[in-house]
Regions:
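Intrinsically disordered, low-complexity regulatory segments enriched in Ser/Thr/Pro
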Residues: 70-139, 143
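Negatively charged, low-complexity tracts enriched in Asp/Glu with abundant Ser/Thr
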Residues: 19-77
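Generic local-structure boundary detector
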Residues: 20, 51, 59, 71, ...
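Mixed-charge, Lys/Arg-enriched low-complexity segments
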Residues: 4-31, 35, 112-160
């Protein structure tokens, strides 16, 4: 049993080194609050640089099983829906098996060739503010994730 758990943890850590392509379903272990931000921003920038983006959905999920201090399995889904060249949405969802969840929803609107806004809760943000707002949202959610993952990381170091 101990050997099985050790191998599972090694697999979780090694998944960080896999190459990533836009549009794939990622099973990542996020170690810091910035990790989710880096992945999602890379894909948002890809979309913003496309002249005529096609419909895409990007999902980011913490590799499972990830056990937190309360023994819960934690999962994060970040979905990017591109409806057409002018509109899209970003959704963040955080779940564990104790019933805890957190959800944030953003709309991306393209009004002119180089003008984008993100809107949420009746607030709108200009294109130049997109990365800051995304980082804020990712930080709030991934901080909760990293608190759980630190436990797994520490366990991995002790049995390595």
């Amino acid at each position: 049993m101990f050997k099985y758990i050790k191998n599972q943890l090694i697999n979780l850590v090694n998944k960080n080194n896999q190459p990533k392509e836009f549009g794939e379903y990622f099973n990542n272990v996020y170690h810091t609050p910035k990790d989710i931000h880096k992945d999602i921003i890379k894909n948002i920038q890809y979309w913003l640089n496309e002249e005529e983006p096609r419909c895409k959905q990007v999902k980011f999920k913490v590799a499972e099983p990830v056990y937190g201090t309360d023994g819960c399995i934690l999962k994060v889904d970040i979905k990017v829906y591109i409806k057409d060249a002018h509109t899209g949405t970003i959704e963040f969802e955080l779940h564990d098996n104790a019933g805890f969840s957190n959800h944030e929803h953003y709309s991306i609107l393209k009004f002119a060739q180089d003008e984008y806004v993100i809107s949420t809760y009746n607030e709108c943000y200009k294109a130049e503010d997109i990365l800051d707002k995304m980082e804020d949202a990712c930080h709030r959610i991934s901080k909760k994730v990293s608190n759980h993952i630190d436990v797994v990381d520490d366990l991995y170091k002790t049995i390595k």
